[in-house]
């Protein structure tokens, strides 16, 4: 693959979180969490940003802030499935050459971190990139709710 010229950012969000029910609408300094995430994704300035939701109140919050939201089925088992469902609606003809999945519970994500997912596509052998960081909190190492990646790093290379 080559570096995307027309990427699409999709942000999955759902109210039925088991760890923090209602988290997309959690108030952070007077605004819903999902609005903060949408703004960070917009600030990355990579392409259109669409929030994939299954509840009207989340869509209303995003649209009220000037964003775009698309309704998805409420029974998607994961955020990745919600992104795929939204992609079928938003880009059925595949006009976007990459999809960047920014999770809806990252209100402090830096736009530069979102941008960091793009350059690896310049390598013709790369079809997917995933941003990771080293787990530094011992409690997170065994927490099943913390996503983990196993990687092989060359000497001197770190996250």
Q: What do these predicted ranges mean?
A:
Residues 3-53:
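N-terminal glycine-rich phosphate-binding loop and ensuing alpha1 helix
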Residues 12, 101-103, 131-134:
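Short beta-strand segments
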Residues 109-159:
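Conserved core of the sugar-phosphate nucleotidyltransferase
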Residues 42, 88-92, 122:
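Residue-level signal for alpha-helix termini/capping positions
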Residues 46, 94-96, 123-127:
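Short, high-confidence coil segments that cap the C-terminus of an alpha-helix
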Residues 50, 56-102, 106-116:
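Short phosphate-binding loop-to-helix
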